[in-house]
């Protein structure tokens, strides 16, 4: 296991949930269900309200692979929209182009999806893009660069991930043409629950 895998293993143990949505981390949690540095039934230290909010914020940060600055800016953007700020926050993060590539099964992880976008493999609405943080909108369409080796890679990824995750209802995927279409912005019930987003809103609201 390399250093990055070890670090991710510690994160899922710290949070007590497989935020990376990959089977190998389920195995780690099953084998070592307690946080790093805590053994067996050792008594947990009491966590303050701020500590709880920080943990939930970190869950979202590491789940989507965003920086502190990116998450802060996403929160500010979420506040500008009508509706529940926490729901808006998750909806924006879900619509990042790297996350959509991941959700569609074109990449085996979000980190891998970021690489795919950064390397110019993705065509968005007919134009090549290289920025993983682009936020998609309804009717946006993603295609793969016309190159046989790239298409072979993406098809292999789809095959590997098809049994591991459910395709979101808010995107449409054509596995034959390797095309993704955003049908609409996801509502809260269309987004997997990996963190308490309301606590994240409280965390940032107190620091606004």
UniProtKB/Swiss-Prot annotation:
Boundaries of every S4 RNA-binding domain copy: 95-157
Record field: transmembrane: none
InterPro entries, per the entry: Ribosomal_uS4, Ribosomal_uS4_bac-type, Ribosomal_uS4_CS, Ribosomal_uS4_N, S4_RNA-bd, S4_RNA-bd_sf
One cellular-component annotation, GO: small ribosomal subunit
Any Gene Ontology biological process: translation
GO molecular function, a single term: structural constituent of ribosome
Keywords: Ribonucleoprotein, Ribosomal protein, RNA-binding, rRNA-binding
Keyword RNA-binding attributed: yes
KW RNA-binding (keyword) present: yes
Stated family: Belongs to the universal ribosomal protein uS4 family.
NCBIfam families named among the record's database cross-references: PRK05327.1, rpsD_bact
Subunit structure: Part of the 30S ribosomal subunit. Contacts protein S5. The interaction surface between S4 and S5 is involved in control of translational fidelity.
Purpose: One of the primary rRNA binding proteins, it binds directly to 16S rRNA where it nucleates assembly of the body of the 30S subunit.
Official protein name in the record: Small ribosomal subunit protein uS4
The encoding gene: rpsD
């Amino acid at each position: 296991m390399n250093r990055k895998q070890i670090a991710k293993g510690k994160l899922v143990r710290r949070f007590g949930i497989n935020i990376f949505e990959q089977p190998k981390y389920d195995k780690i949690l099953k084998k070592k269900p307690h946080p790093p540095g805590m053994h067996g039934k050792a008594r947990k230290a009491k966590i303050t309200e701020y500590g709880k909010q920080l943990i939930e914020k970190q869950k979202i940060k590491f789940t989507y692979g965003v920086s502190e600055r990116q998450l802060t800016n996403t929160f500010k953007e979420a506040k500008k929209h009508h509706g529940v700020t926490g729901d808006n926050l998750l909806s924006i993060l879900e619509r990042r182009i790297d996350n959509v590539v991941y959700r569609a099964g074109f990449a085996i992880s979000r980190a891998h999806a970021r690489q795919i976008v950064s390397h110019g493999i993705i065509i968005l609405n007919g134009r090549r893009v290289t920025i993983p943080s682009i936020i998609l909108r309804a009717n946006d369409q993603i295609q793969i660069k016309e190159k046989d080796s790239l298409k072979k890679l993406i098809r292999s990824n789809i095959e590997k991930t098809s049994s591991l995750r459910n395709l979101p209802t808010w995107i449409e995927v054509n596995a034959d043409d390797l095309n993704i279409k955003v049908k609409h912005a996801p509502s809260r019930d269309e987004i997997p629950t990996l963190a308490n987003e309301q606590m994240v809103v409280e965390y940032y609201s107190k620091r606004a």
